[in-house]
Curated annotation (Swiss-Prot):
This is Holo-[acyl-carrier-protein] synthase. HAMAP family: AcpS. It comes from the Bacteria. It catalyses: apo-[ACP] + CoA = holo-[ACP] + adenosine 3',5'-bisphosphate + H(+). Its EC number is 2.7.8.7. NCBIfam families: acpS, pantethn_trn. Mg(2+) binds at residues 8, 58. It is an enzyme of class 2 (transferase). Belongs to the P-Pant transferase superfamily. AcpS family. The gene is acpS. Transfers the 4'-phosphopantetheine moiety from coenzyme A to a Ser of acyl-carrier-protein. It comes from Limosilactobacillus reuteri (strain DSM 20016).
Length: 120
């Protein structure tokens, strides 16, 4: 049974500017494991990865019903690419199944997260 759906669209350039302007931005958004994956990329691909994680976590927070804030932070959610590049939610406060999807254009990243209960 679907418990929540969240979508987000983020401008990649906006995330790039935030990362450039604020030295701790990347560490604020990414968990240590996500930072490991991030470090494997360079140039535009690293910016796309960061924008994708920002957007995925925003989508998760919307599906969860809280938004990012006092009750849910960026480090409460971890999303790692599997061997095929698909995003997998590996850490979250949600006890059911979490399904994530991400897509990029040259300027935008769009994400969706669906939270599903384990009981059907």
């Amino acid at each position: 049974m679907i418990k929540g759906i969240g979508i987000d669209i983020t401008e990649i350039e906006r995330v790039k500017k935030a990362a450039t302007a604020h030295s701790q931005f990347i560490q604020h958004v990414l968990t240590p494991t996500e930072l490991e994956q991030y470090s494997q990329f360079s140039g535009q691909r690293s910016v796309e990865y960061l924008a994708g994680r920002w957007s995925l976590k925003e989508s998760f927070a919307k599906a969860y019903g809280t938004g990012i804030g006092a009750n849910l932070g960026f480090h409460d959610i971890e999303i790692i690419d599997n061997q095929y590049g698909a995003p997998i939610v590996t850490k979250s406060p949600y006890n059911g199944n979490a399904h994530a999807s991400v897509s990029h254009t040259a300027t935008l990243v769009m994400t969706e997260v669906i939270l599903e209960s384990e009981n059907k």
